[in-house]
Structures are given as structure tokens and as C-alpha cells.
A protein has these predicted regions:
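Conserved short "hinge" loops at termini or chain/domain junctions
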Residues: 1-62, 92, 96, 103-118
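Structural motif
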Residues: 62-72
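Short, hydrophobic/amphipathic alpha-helical patches that form generic packing surfaces
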Residues: 71-83
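Mid-sequence acidic-hydrophobic segments that form the walls
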Residues: 80-84, 101-108
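Charged, low-complexity interaction regions
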Residues: 84-90
Length: 118
């Protein structure tokens, strides 16, 4: 999925889709890309140790597992976008959803317990 599609889903979740129809989204695009990169970095390091590269163009694909891209990232982007717009009710609502969903990434990871050899 591309960055633009994640941003579009977040905008739709927030009910800000009327911005697209009025043409007032142009100043909103940089905030949206910043929000996406913030969430992308957050979930990237839950799944990987290194290799993060910021998304610089909304047409770029987001290389994360499918469940992260479709089910987790849009809620985080929505939370940060709501915050940037001063929409505290939506910011709180989507932050809670994002944090609950983000916890599932850690549950899916397996940890191996090893006793060190001396």
C-alpha cells in the first residue's frame, strides 16, 4: 500500500474527507506526510532493528507487514493528524485505538529465552 492510501484512509476515518472536495488539502499534505513518517518509524522499529528510511513522497510504498499497514498505521496517522488540527476528541479516540493495536505487534513477536553458556 502506498503512503497516500494510508493517509487517505486516516482522513476518511477522521471524517476530514470534505477537505478533498474543497481543495483545501494542499497545506494539509505536509502534516499528513509527517504524521505518516512518525507512525511508520514507530511501528518499523517494533518489527525491525535497523534500515528505516523516511517516506518522502506519498506515492511511495510502505514496506511493512500487511496487518500493520492496513490495520494499525491508519489509526496512528489519524491520531497525529487530529492533533495537528487541534481536534482533541479525535486525537484521544484514535490514539487509544492505535496504542491498543500497536501492542498486538509485540504479542505476535516471539522471544527466545536462552541461558548463557559460560
Amino acid at each position: 500500500m502506498t503512503a497516500a492510501k494510508i493517509i487517505d484512509k486516516a482522513i476518511l476515518l477522521l471524517g476530514y474527507d470534505t477537505l478533498k472536495n474543497t481543495g483545501s488539502i494542499s497545506g494539509f499534505e505536509q502534516s499528513a506526510l509527517t504524521a505518516l513518517n512518525t507512525v511508520y518509524a514507530d511501528v518499523f522499529y517494533l518489527c525491525n532493528k535497523e534500515g528505516f528510511q523516511e517516506i518522502t513522497d506519498a506515492s511511495q510504498p510502505v514496506n511493512m507487514p500487511e496487518n500493520v499497514v492496513f490495520d494499525i498505521m491508519p489509526y496512528g496517522v489519524a491520531a497525529f493528524l487530529a492533533s495537528s488540527q487541534g481536534d482533541s476528541d479525535n486525537q484521544l479516540f484514535f490514539s487509544r485505538i492505535y496504542n491498543l493495536k500497536r501492542k498486538n505487534i509485540l504479542k505476535e513477536m516471539t522471544f527466545e529465552d536462552k541461558i548463557p553458556t559460560v
